Every structure is written in structure tokens, then in C-alpha cells.
Amino acid sequence: MTETEAVVDQIDLNGALPEKKKKPKKSVAFDDEVDAVSKDGPEASSAGATDEDDSERKSSAKDLTTPVTEGEVDELKDMFSSMKKKKKSKKSSASAEEQTEDITTESGELDFSSMKKKKKKKKSADLSAFEKELEASSTGDATSDLSKQTFDSENMGEHAWLKSDRDYYYPELLNRFFTLLRTNNPELAGEKRKYTIVPPSVHREGKKTIFANISDISKRMHRSLDHVIQFLFAELGTSGSVDGSSRLIIKGRFQQKQIENVLRRYIVEYVTCKTCKSPDTILTKENRIFFMTCEACGSVRSVQAIKTGYQAQIGKRKHVS
């Protein structure tokens, strides 16, 4: 009969647990003890080791045979319940932001909430400055009204300063100076006189175009009728003739706009002066070259001869047999 069986018999008979034996404490072996052990030999050390193994086996057997009470079971449950995984509770974004703000303020770190863009407030207008601007604008309007009144009165032929003892205004004197200059010396006023001619009267007769007032236009330009007709035929690319009532009959159908454009080119090239833009010029021919002399400025320049360009086919083509 082994020792463990004897212990179990004691538990069953008496119903009480046997007293636990205390484990022998291990002592640290110093140099003297090591020498003593070495003197005793390997037999003493092996005997001590076997005694320790037997005591450990007895204590483990006693632990297995001891009954577990309800209190100990509850303690074990509490211990294992604390070992379960805890579910992470989702924190609301608002609470998290509040915590972060508290942490930043307490720890003394930067507060990034102040980095948000703030809406600009409209500046309240200064009433005094606004009133000053109004006064300045009103004075400016008054001066402009005065100048307008003076100019209007002068345009009507009335001089406001003649009927009163007030001081003269600069715009009044300036306007008076220019009016006197224009009346006494019109050529020094700097104004360009517009050169106007009678519009050409053009109408159709079948496949022909009749230019009725060509003689009047040539007299107004101070140019010969033959020279004007020659330029017209060269530009329009056609031919024609003059009837008994000094009307030009042009072969082909042409509109009034086309003849007006041709006359404008003739005036620019053979009538107006290139220096002073005056229409008072004379066209003369010397050694088969045309010269244009200006009566206003006295300049003389040569003019190109009229060249016949493209000739339009008007009549029927002759069939060569």
C-alpha cells in the first residue's frame, strides 16, 4: 500500500483534509558547503535529490485529492470573466473633438480651430467722409454747369461778361479767341474742309448703263471729261460713248455703288494734294507725263498715266471658220 492510497483512505474515513506539509526551503550552497558535498561524494547528493522528488509527488497528489468549494469556483469564474475580450465602443465624433480640444488647451499645443477662414465683416462707411465726397462732387457739378451755361450763351451769340461786372472765366476767353480766329483767318483755324461732289445719277437701259451727270462732276473736280471717261473705262473694264446730251453710255450692267467707288479712287489719285489734302489742284501734261500742282501749298508731283487693265468681253465672240 502506497502513501497516496493511505492519504485517500484517511480523507474518506475522517472527512477532513490532512495537514499540508511545508516544502523544504532550498539553501544556497556556498564554497564551504560545496566542499562538504564534494567530500561526502555523489551518493549523498543523489539521496537528497530522491527525497525532494518524493515530497513533490506527495504534495501534487494531495492537491488533486482536495475538494473545491463554491467560493473558490466563483473566484475562478471572476478571474476568467475578466480575461474576455472587451468590445471597443465607438466614440462619437463630437466627443472626440471635444477631448482633442481639451488636450490641446491643457498641454499648451497649437489650437488648429483658429486656422479656419473667418468671414470678412463689411466695413461700416464713415458718414463724415461720405458727406465730404458729396460736397466735392456738388461743387464740381456746379462748375461744370457754369461752363456749360457760358458755352451755351456764346453759341447763341450772347457774351455774358458784357452785361455784368464779374470776372472772366478761362473757357469763355478761350472760346472767344477761337471764334475770332476762325472768322478772321479760316485757313489758319486748322479745320479740314470736306470735299463733296454730286452723287452720280445712274440708270439702266437694257444691257447698257447710262451715266447722266458726268459732265457736272468733271467740272466740279476741275478735270477734263475725256480724262474722267478714260479712267472709268479702265477701272470698269468696258467701253462706251457720249451721246448728244453729254451723257455717258457704258456697255454692260453696273450699279451706282460701283461707279461711286471708281470716282473716289479718281479723286484720291488725280484730284487731292498728298501734302495738304486740298482739292484745289490743277492737272497738266508735260512731255507725255502728267503733273499735279496744288494751289494751296504750291507742291508739285507727278501722276501715273491711266493704264487699261482687264477688258470685259461684252459683245458676241466672232466664230473663226
Swiss-Prot record:
Subcellular location, record wording: Cytoplasm, Cytosol
The keyword Transcription regulation is assigned to this record: no
Keyword Heme: no
Main localization (coarse): cytoplasm
Cellular compartments per GO CC: cytosol; eukaryotic translation initiation factor 2 complex; multi-eIF complex
Zinc finger (C4-type): 273-297
Family annotation (Pfam families): eIF-5_eIF-2B
Modified residues (Phosphoserine): 45, 137-138
InterPro entries: IF2/IF5, Transl_init_fac_IF2/IF5_dom, Transl_init_fac_IF2/IF5_N, Transl_init_fac_IF2/IF5_Zn-bd
GO biological process: formation of translation preinitiation complex
SUPFAM superfamilies attached to this UniProt entry: Translation initiation factor 2 beta, aIF2beta, N-terminal domain, Zinc-binding domain of translation initiation factor 2 beta
GO molecular function, one term: mRNA binding
Residues covered by region (Disordered): 1-117
Positions of post-translational Phosphothreonine modification: 139
Alphabetized UniProt keyword annotations: Cytoplasm, Initiation factor, Metal-binding, Phosphoprotein, Protein biosynthesis, Zinc, Zinc-finger
NCBIfam families linked to this entry: PRK03988.1
Function of the molecule: Component of the eIF2 complex that functions in the early steps of protein synthesis by forming a ternary complex with GTP and initiator tRNA. This complex binds to a 40S ribosomal subunit, followed by mRNA binding to form a 43S pre-initiation complex (43S PIC). Junction of the 60S ribosomal subunit to form the 80S initiation complex is preceded by hydrolysis of the GTP bound to eIF2 and release of an eIF2-GDP binary complex. In order for eIF2 to recycle and catalyze another round of initiation, the GDP bound to eIF2 must exchange with GTP by way of a reaction catalyzed by eIF2B.
Similarity remark: Belongs to the eIF-2-beta/eIF-5 family.
This protein's name: Probable eukaryotic translation initiation factor 2 subunit beta
Organism: Schizosaccharomyces pombe (strain 972 / ATCC 24843) (Fission yeast)
